[in-house]
Amino acid sequence: MSEPLLTVADSLKDRARAALGSRNLILVGLMGAGKSAVGRIVASQLGIPFIDSDHEIERVSRMTIPELFAAYGEDEFRALETRVMKRLLKGGPRVVSTGGGAFINERTRRHIIKGGVSVWLKADLDVLWERVNKRDNRPLLKTENPKQTLEGLMNARYPIYAQADLTVLSRDVRKEIMADEVLKAMIEAQKESAAS
């Protein structure tokens, strides 16, 4: 009896898993970029755990993100986020989705860079707005003109997100396609690293 042939999908997963090794894969980007949705699929494809850092922050604080912002302000929230990210990134491999501001905080960014492979899910304003406009749980968008606020966040944060190890364009396609593109970006980065 012959061995079953590997499918292209199996091969992609195996090569991406080998490229990751024992490191963490950390997804960064603005709210609505798809970090959690894509992260869950990537983790499943790689056969490693997925952790949403915002959910972990809510678990340890026993408060929602909006409650934390209201009670303690953004600075205290960012300090807690840094502590949680530092702890999450000690183990591995795993896929970690971050809150939109995590990579912007210099201390948190250092932990992310040291803790694994960072992937920026980069989306344009219209894609982000379409996704975040449907929910009312975004503390930073509680303004008179939330779309303009989102654009301001893009302008301020995109140069910092660009420091991530890899960039994958987040657009209006199925999450599974985005997950495959993350895997392909990891494989390509490993090839380039091996060639240099």
Curated annotation (Swiss-Prot):
Binds 1 Mg(2+) ion per subunit. InterPro entries: P-loop_NTPase, Shikimate/glucono_kinase, Shikimate_kinase/TSH1, Shikimate_kinase_CS. Its cofactor is Mg(2+). Pfam families: SKI. Mg(2+) binds at residue 36. Its EC number is 2.7.1.71. It catalyses: shikimate + ATP = 3-phosphoshikimate + ADP + H(+). SUPFAM superfamilies: P-loop containing nucleoside triphosphate hydrolases. Substrate binds at residues 54, 78, 100, 157. One of its GO terms (cellular component) is cytosol. Pathway: Metabolic intermediate biosynthesis; chorismate biosynthesis; chorismate from D-erythrose 4-phosphate and phosphoenolpyruvate: step 5/7. ATP binds at residues 32-37, 138, 174. GO terms for biological process: amino acid biosynthetic process; aromatic amino acid family biosynthetic process; chorismate biosynthetic process. Keywords: Amino-acid biosynthesis, Aromatic amino acid biosynthesis, ATP-binding, Cytoplasm, Kinase, Magnesium, Metal-binding, Nucleotide-binding, Transferase. It is found in: Cytoplasm. One of its GO terms (molecular function) is shikimate kinase activity. The keyword Amino-acid biosynthesis applies. Belongs to the shikimate kinase family. Catalyzes the specific phosphorylation of the 3-hydroxyl group of shikimic acid using ATP as a cosubstrate. Monomer. This is Shikimate kinase. It comes from Rhizobium leguminosarum bv. trifolii (strain WSM2304).
